[in-house]
Amino acid sequence: MAETVSPLKHFVLAKKAITAIFGQLLEFVTEGSHFVEATYRNPELDRIASEDDLVEIQGYRNKLAVIGEVLSRRHMKVAFFGRTSSGKSSVINAMLWDKVLPSGIGHTTNCFLSVEGTDGDKAYLMTEGSDEKKSVKTVNQLAHALHMDKDLKAGCLVHVFWPKAKCALLRDDLVLVDSPGTDVTTELDIWIDKFCLDADVFVLVANSESTLMNTEKHFFHKVNERLSKPNIFILNNRWDASASEPEYMEDVRRQHMERCLHFLVEELKVVSPSEARNRIFFVSAKEVLNSRKHKAQGMPEGGGALAEGFQARLQEFQNFEQTFEECISQSAVKTKFEQHTIRAKQILDTVKNILDSVNVAAAEKRVYSMEEREDQIDRLDFIRNQMNLLTLDVKKKIKEVTEEVANKVSCAMTDEICRLSVLVDEFCSEFHPTPSVLKVYKSELNKHIEDGMGRNLADRCTNEVNASILQSQQEIIENLKPLLPAGIQNKLHTLIPCKKFDLSYDLNCHKLCSDFQEDIVFRFSLGWSSLVHRFLGSTNAQRVLLGLSEPIFQVPRSLASTPTAPSNPAAPDNAAQEELMITLITGLASLTSRTSMGIIVVGGVIWKTVGWKLISVTLSMYGALYLYERLTWTTRAKERAFKQQFVNYATEKLQMIVSFTSANCSHQVQQEMATTFARLCQQVDVTQKHLEEEIARLSKEIDQLEKIQNNSKLLRNKAVQLESELENFSKQFLHPSSGES
């Protein structure tokens, strides 16, 4: 027989294809699970992926891992049933081209035997509930092992692993299950649940020397109740016995055929009449096994004593094998893989929906984030532009306010200087011309003037300055408010309280009047010095009096050291002193030479003109006036003179610092307003920083969302590709006829 490709390869190819697809599907769902989990657990991406999505896709990953393991263990399974000694083991051996299972006289299968291939070169068996691999070298050894194990009952399963190298049929993921006779047990339901639910094909091995028995029919009726239209083949074994009675062969064959057709079509209703004829065969398993063993040994197939009609029976057995292989491969592919294929499509649909929902949520949030980022960028630009404009306006406003304050302080201080005499007159303290008392008196007077002028200036300026500052601060705050968040606007008065501002005038009268020198020595109003002062002025009188009272050759004292001078003018330089000395010496020489003569002449003229009485009266009045002034020159008079001198001196000094004090006050106001504006600018800077951070966060979020969109699209494309592969698998293996049409 020419070698052809076995139909069983169809299952092998299908298993390989579906296993590869499920491997890709598991990899895809695992990748999708990691993607959804990373998206769900990202704290910056809220509500993009839900916990339900994560739980669902992780559940699919676990299910696919289990399905993958199940698929790797999937194989085609054919179960052989029949009465005891009907030749079930012989049929299996004939299909395997070797005597794998014990059969023949003295050998009955006392438990379920599962024959499958192993990649090793040694046969072994494993009993149910044990992982021990028991070595089996020969069939007789296998038979002995089965019969010697007293624990093996009819409902037990023994796995027989036969080297694939010795049997071609076992290379294609086919498992053959031999069973005890259906007439030896009443536990048919247990058998069916345990061994038949995953079988792809059932083979009823009947003895052609008798008809179908009720025990056989009863078993398959129960199978039909548990499975939907099971694939059942009927082998009428030992058909070689009909060769001894050739005249009855066709009648017996027709009789068996009719009963088998009735059983499959009418009773079980699993196939149509035309299909049923292809499920019923008349064979001799023993003949086929012997001929195939001869062929394997290089001997002729027809060698030995064979009954007549062997070739026909051999051909029918081969037809059975061909039909069986086609049926089981199609059936196994459908039963083993169709539901998994449908489940895979459902999983892909669900995962696609999850990816689509993530993609849509990411797209919506990305659009929202982009719009929000644009708003934040616009607001940041607006704040920066407004701050540039407001800074110029605030600088201008501060300049106006400081100039206004400087003018107010200058005017108020000028007025207070004019009223300095009143302030000095209000001062009361112990006065005495002694130096120690005068020192204390001057110190207290300086403090009184400083406190009084400071208080008066504050009364006149502080309220107006405060009102102006508060108004300006409120204007600045109102202008900056729109640049701040609502939460900061409500707390703005707490962050920047509008407190009362007190100007510090810092007159420092003690230091200002530290070089004041009082002149409280008694001076007669009609005395020579007073008259000279009155008519010549202080400077000229000083020069004249200095010239008359000094010796000619005496070096003149520095003007700064004159105790009687009300003020201390600056000492002349060396050249001026020398010039003054020469002039005085010349004048004194001339005056001294003429004084005596002048007095005598003037006195004589007056004496002759008015007489001595008038002179006496005049001298008496002059003396009385002198006496009056001398008596009234009391301590109080000295204090009044001291205060007047101090007022004149302090007025001159205070007028010198009017501009400085006003500038100092305006600087204080400028600092206060600048500080307030700086605090507001800090809040604006914080707002700008928050905006910049928010823009950076949104940009990062947008990039992440874009990446999520791209990843979800890539994963979805993989899902579509896997769907296409599943569809191709369905067309190629599950529905080949529809695919061809």
Swiss-Prot record:
Residues 82-89 are annotated as: G1 motif. Keywords: Coiled coil, Developmental protein, GTP-binding, Hydrolase, Membrane, Mitochondrion, Mitochondrion outer membrane, Nucleotide-binding, Transmembrane, Transmembrane helix, Ubl conjugation. Its EC number is 3.6.5.-. It is found in: Mitochondrion outer membrane. Detected in adult heart. Detected in embryos (at protein level). Widely expressed. PROSITE patterns: G_DYNAMIN_2. Residues 108-109 are annotated as: G2 motif. The keyword Nucleotide-binding applies. Homodimer, also in the absence of bound GTP. Forms higher oligomers in the presence of a transition state GTP analog. Forms homomultimers and heteromultimers with MFN2. Oligomerization is essential for mitochondrion fusion. Component of a high molecular weight multiprotein complex. Interacts with VAT1. Interacts with THG1L; THG1L probably functions as a guanyl-nucleotide exchange factor/GEF, activating MFN1. This is Mitofusin-1. It comes from Mus musculus (Mouse). The gene is Mfn1.
